[in-house]
């Protein structure tokens, strides 16, 4: 389950911090989980997951931030590296529809702090290949200031036959081990 995946990632980050004497270490996270029947969006922190449907951008992740602050950015309420003894990790998980041609954007706040949703939507709506769109998002985020790291993953659901081929590929990888 996504909760278990997040728990294991969190433990790994906490363990690394402890082993290397880093007491303030963390990361946001956004991921898509695929099963043969469905797809799930999961996030911690303020990294976002968007969905493009008919040219309209929709945020499907939840920002885990403390209420608005007068100055600067709101602190995160959930993130990888959050010690279990301080607070329980509660990732946001949403089951989402997947159809051929649907596009999903996973990105860090290095994108969303620099570009508005309407700017992101305009870039994603362009009739270009995925690598070109990613480069355009990156270029625009950096031109607007790029004060934080800029992480972008853009994926498009292909024909369901691709899912079958991917399963075979994964099975072959396991068989080789």
Name what the model sees in each region.
Residues 2-177:
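PP2C/PPM-type serine/threonine phosphatase catalytic domain
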């Amino acid at each position: 389950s996504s909760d278990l995946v997040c728990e294991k990632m969190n433990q790994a980050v906490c363990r690394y911090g402890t082993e290397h004497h880093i007491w303030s270490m963390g990361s946001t996270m956004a991921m898509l989980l695929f099963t043969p029947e469905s797809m799930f969006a999961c996030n911690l922190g303020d990294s976002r997951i968007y969905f493009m449907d008919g040219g309209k951008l929709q945020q499907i992740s939840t920002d885990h931030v403390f209420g608005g602050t007068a100055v600067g950015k709101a602190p995160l309420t959930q993130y990888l590296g959050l010690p279990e003894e301080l607070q329980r990790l509660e990732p946001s998980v949403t089951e989402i529809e997947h159809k051929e041609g649907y596009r999903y954007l996973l990105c860090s706040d290095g994108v969303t702090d620099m570009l508005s949703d309407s700017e992101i939507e305009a870039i994603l709506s362009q009739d270009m290949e995925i690598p070109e769109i990613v480069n355009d998002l990156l270029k625009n985020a950096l031109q607007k200031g790029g004060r934080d790291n800029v992480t972008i993953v853009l994926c498009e659901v292909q024909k369901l036959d691709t899912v079958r081929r991917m399963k075979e590929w994964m099975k072959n990888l396991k068989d080789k081990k």
